[in-house]
Regions:
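Phosphate-ester processing/binding pockets and catalytic centers
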Residues: 1-226
């Protein structure tokens, strides 16, 4: 079987718990190497160009909140940016998986690392045969946090003999933005489940919790690794 690429991104840090950032999230985006991304990427770039945002680097949370480079941009434009990225996910047939840890339940860096390993290990074990069938498993990570590099070693490199950790290439920048959108939508869904409501910027962007679940979360979940 052809190879598979796994792009890994993270949200959060290994510092102390803070109420505004209650979760640490590791996101894996999967793409079979045999399927070329270039024509799909061209479609995304064209869509952004039409919106007047050529070569724009998409940041999902600021787009939803209307912050940073999205401050003052019309709501309709911000929605179109994320909808175009969502369409790219479906067109490229990506699969993703998000792994959550509540930082309030992990007292320190060691406990947080162990908690992340505890949620990733069962997934890898359950999919061991499926992943082993690929000729190569190429893992792309920007090595932004040494703990995640160590996690990759312990959960993937030490368990498979066909893992190659590769450098981040320019084509991976859009995959990073895919991982960011997956993480953002799933994080909002997790908090919605925990507290029962969206915050004010999210309500303005999505309209209602029901609309968020039906038109955004449900759409994204079509691409979750199963």
């Amino acid at each position: 079987m052809n190879g598979i690429e796994i792009f890994i991104d993270e949200s959060g840090d290994f510092g102390a718990y803070e109420a505004h950032c209650p979760y640490y999230v590791v996101t894996m985006v999967f793409h079979e190497s045999a399927d070329s991304l270039y024509d799909k990427l061209e479609g995304l770039e064209y869509s952004l160009d039409v919106l007047g945002l050529a070569e724009h680097c998409i940041h999902s949370n600021p787009a939803i909140r209307g912050e940073d480079e999205y401050f003052g941009l019309p709501l309709s434009l911000r929605r179109k940016v994320l909808l175009n990225l969502m369409a790219f996910i479906h067109n490229a047939d990506f699969r993703f998986k998000c792994f959550f840890v509540k930082k309030c339940e992990a007292g320190d860096e060691t406990a947080l690392f162990a908690a992340l390993k505890d949620v990733i290990d069962p997934f890898v074990s359950a999919n061991f045969k499926r992943l082993s069938a690929y000729s190569t498993i190429k893992v792309a990570y920007d090595k932004g946090q040494r703990q995640i590099s160590r996690l990759i070693t312990q959960t993937l490199e030490e368990r498979f003999d066909n893992v190659q950790v590769v450098k981040i290439l320019p084509i991976h920048s859009r995959l990073s933005q895919v991982a960011d959108l997956c993480c953002t939508i799933k994080r909002i869904a997790q908090r919605l489940s925990d507290v029962g409501s969206l915050n004010k910027p999210e309500l303005y962007f999505f309209g209602t919790a029901k609309n968020f679940r039906r038109n955004w979360l449900k759409s994204l979940m079509r691409s979750e690794w199963k």
